[in-house]
């Protein structure tokens, strides 16, 4: 084995995790044959030079993130995560199934609440969720779709079984890194990339635009779509810019929009133009100061009323956050059975509902063994990994749980699967998760082949979030047949403003938006 992999098998064995590239020992799995062969031919100098080249490219293209106040290129490791076709088939079916169930759940809880009446979930589960918005109860979104875009976080446990870890149907973020990672890795490891059939990811913008246009208000033959961003200070602004550009639509801020007569218009250099579909990248609380936070400068007054009247489609729909609630997550297998009459394709991670007395007592006796998460947390913030926590941290956690049991869940510590990752002068096993992205047009749920593989760059760490020092990998889904290139979309010919304006935003807004969009 290459010197780059010295001591790898020993480190992988110590982790106790399922390794994506190697079976126990040093034999590469069949799906990794081309990657293994390519890496064996490279020296440390070769690998380091390619890694540095990818980082420079990311910096030049603006593929960056803010870490402790410093703008850095988003870390991309040179070893891809490879998923064979048969495993992807399971993931694809499981993600699509979950999206359909969450779509049905959201439509129900903002309507008849049959799921409550039939005793599948308690009413308090819905009404006590921080992101259940009564302001949008009782109306159907234009186009009839609530979950246009989703990111379902999936992990593989020590036995090699895929499990859903989290649902993201509010403002799922990260697909820009999927697109940019593929662009970089096609050049970063061409010896392996060009020797096998890898499912393309470049179709995502076309699929997204098609779904947004299909769910436009009735009677609109040629809908105008915009991407609504909080502005240049937002941590995901690069993604907003990239997607708007790739779809050929306008990127707007709240102050570019006007609501009048339950219609939405954008200010352009040629005058006002009606907007039919808003792909919002703003959390609900900041979307409409007439309905939510009155001090918000990020949205536009009247958007919710316009949506209620059917004058505009907002994607994702306002109120979706209730489905992101981690306590609701624990009921999703039941929701799949209730709405779809199917068994879950991908199981949940075992979850303790701390609002239940018996579960709470059991967890409080085992805090040092479990992962405890706030139900409305994101970006890995607020969770406590028991084995890594100090006695003081566990005592503080105990008090918070007792003060607000509804606000917490607990799960066993999963040894997430590992993939070789460059660390210093060699590759070491590092834990990964996977966020497949799905696009729902109302008739079909399309799952982007692969998704965002996030990697914990610190040895032994289970925290993969970029906001806490994580990185990413390109995700290669293998196919048995050659893949066709994606069709490029036309660019927009409308100019909203001559220049993107930079305007001050309160720091707490920036922080909250950053947290919400991990």
What feature does the model see in each segment?
Residues 1-518:
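Preference for protein termini
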């Amino acid at each position: 084995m290459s010197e780059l992999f010295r001591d790898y098998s020993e480190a992988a064995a110590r982790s106790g995790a399922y390794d994506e590239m190697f079976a126990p020992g040093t034999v590469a799995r069949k799906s990794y044959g081309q990657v293994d062969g390519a890496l064996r031919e490279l020296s440390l100098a070769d690998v380091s030079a390619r890694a540095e080249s990818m980082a420079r490219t990311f910096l030049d293209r603006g593929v960056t993130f803010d870490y402790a106040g410093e703008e850095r290129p988003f870390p991309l490791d040179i070893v891809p995560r490879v998923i064979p076709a048969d495993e992807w088939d399971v993931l694809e079916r499981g993600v699509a199934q979950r999206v359909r169930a969450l779509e049905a759940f959201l439509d129900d809880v903002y309507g008849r609440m049959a799921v409550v009446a039939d005793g599948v979930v308690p009413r308090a589960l819905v009404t006590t969720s921080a992101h259940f918005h009564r302001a949008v109860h009782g109306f159907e979104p234009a186009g009839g779709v609530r979950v246009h875009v989703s990111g379902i976080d999936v992990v593989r446990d020590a036995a090699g079984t895929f499990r859903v870890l989290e649902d993201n149907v509010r403002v799922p973020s990260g697909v820009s890194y999927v697109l940019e990672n593929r662009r970089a890795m096609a050049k970063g490891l061409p010896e392996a990339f060009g020797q096998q059939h890898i499912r393309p990811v470049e179709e995502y913008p076309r699929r997204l635009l098609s779904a947004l246009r299909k769910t436009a208000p009735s009677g609109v033959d040629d809908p105008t779509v915009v991407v609504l961003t909080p502005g240049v200070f937002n941590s995901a602004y690069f993604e907003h810019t990239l997607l708007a550009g790739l779809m050929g639509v306008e990127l707007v801020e709240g102050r570019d929009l006007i609501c009048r007569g339950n219609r939405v218009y954008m200010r352009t250099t040629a005058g006002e133009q009606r907007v039919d579909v808003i792909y919002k990248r703003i959390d609900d609380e900041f979307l409409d100061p007439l309905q939510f936070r009155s001090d918000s400068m990020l949205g536009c007054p009247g958007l919710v009323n316009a949506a209620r009247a059917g004058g505009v489609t907002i994607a994702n729909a306002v109120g979706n956050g209730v489905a992101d609630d981690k306590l609701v997550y624990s009921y999703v297998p039941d929701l799949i059975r209730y709405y779809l009459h199917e068994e879950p394709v991908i199981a949940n991670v075992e979850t303790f509902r701390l609002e239940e007395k018996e579960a709470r007592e059991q967890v409080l006796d085992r805090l040092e063994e479990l992962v405890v998460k706030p139900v409305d947390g994101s970006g890995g913030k607020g969770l406590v990994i028991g084995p890594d926590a100090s006695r003081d941290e566990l005592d503080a956690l105990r008090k918070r749980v007792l003060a607000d049991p509804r606000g917490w869940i607990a799960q066993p510590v999963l040894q997430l699967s590992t993939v070789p990752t460059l660390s210093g002068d060699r590759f070491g096993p590092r834990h990964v998760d996977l966020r497949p992205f799905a696009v729902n047009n109302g008739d079909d749920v399309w799952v982007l082949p692969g998704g965002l593989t996030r990697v914990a760059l610190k040895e032994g760490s289970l925290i993969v979030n970029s906001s806490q020092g994580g990185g990413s990998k390109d995700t290669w889904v293998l196919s048995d047949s050659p893949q066709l290139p994606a069709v490029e979309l036309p660019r927009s010919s409308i100019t909203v403003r001559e220049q993107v304006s930079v305007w001050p935003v309160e720091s707490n807004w920036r922080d909250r938006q950053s947290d919400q969009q991990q």
